[in-house]
Design a protein with these regions (language model features):
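Structured catalytic-domain cores with a bias toward divalent-metal coordination
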Residues: 1-266
Length: 266
């Protein structure tokens, strides 16, 4: 943002609000939740003006953002997983949001089934009130990946140009893959069959073939390999386990099936 504002002040045509963190108390204490309450703020929207401090804060945030041309809710992943840059969309709002998301310079647009979407999130609350909101996930929790930051910045300026907010030069954006997961057609999951230490063999964004080795689970006491983790389908490994300790059922990765990679159209 500093680069663009220093060089192109005459390119701005409207107001852009930037919120570095919606949970500054959590940033200060290096936690996702609200300190003392251990409460995930992104599970209490739209909030309540007559509720406790946390619900009141959530309600004020929704009121502040409601009515914007577009809201972009930017997240890193959690500390357990690393993700390629992607936008996640509830299928209930796909018709409005997918065409917008395709201008955002992300690698993947992932449309979820309605049954898997949490209704208490900021994005769901704003979209339900008619304010278009995109959820961006990229990288790994508690870290900043400069490469992804630059990619997201180009995407933001592309979107602002689309909405007439930015009138200066606009970078070209990549063509996003659009995956529909309402019925599990495009995405498959890798879950740990046992507990142990997970050692990945593939980075996120890697192309894999069916039954190709993507990681191993090792017994931490003996060093013995107790499970080989193989790709269930050919495609792209767009989520990879970053945190090594796993339990039975832990998510270790997600594969975007090959057919979704070749379609690339809505």
């Amino acid at each position: 943002m500093k680069l663009y504002t220093e060089c192109h002040w005459d390119g701005w045509d409207r107001i852009v609000d930037i919120y570095p963190a919606m949970n500054p108390f959590g940033i200060d204490s290096i936690t996702r939740g609200i300190p003392a309450f251990d409460l995930d703020m992104n599970r209490i929207f739209p909030g309540n003006m007559d509720g406790d401090m946390n619900e009141y804060m959530a309600s004020k945030i929704v009121g502040e953002l409601q009515g914007a041309d577009l809201v972009i809710d930017i997240h890193a992943s959690n500390i357990f997983l690393t993700e390629i840059p992607q936008i996640r969309i509830n299928e209930l709002h796909a018709k409005e949001l997918v065409p917008i998301a395709q201008k955002a310079n992300m690698d993947l647009i992932w449309v979820h089934g309605a049954s898997t979407v949490l209704e208490s999130t900021l994005a769901y609350s704003l979209n339900s009130k008619g304010t278009n909101t995109l959820v961006v996930e990229m990288g790994v929790g508690m870290r900043i990946t400069p490469e992804y930051g630059r990619q997201m910045t180009d995407g933001i300026f592309s979107l602002m140009s689309e909405f007439g907010i930015w009138t200066g030069d606009t970078p070209s954006v990549r063509e996003s893959i659009v995956a529909y997961d309402a019925d599990g057609d495009d995405v498959c999951y890798l879950n740990a069959p046992c507990s142990g230490i997970y050692m990945k063999e593939k980075e996120h964004g890697s192309l894999v073939k069916k039954d190709e080795l993507v990681g191993r689970i090792i017994n931490p006491l003996s060093g013995e390999v107790i499970a080989d983790i193989k790709a269930p389908e050919s495609g792209m490994l767009f989520t990879v386990r970053e945190y090594p300790v796993v339990e039975d059922g832990s998510l270790m990765g997600r594969v975007l099936k090959e057919k979704a990679l070749t379609e690339k159209v809505v």
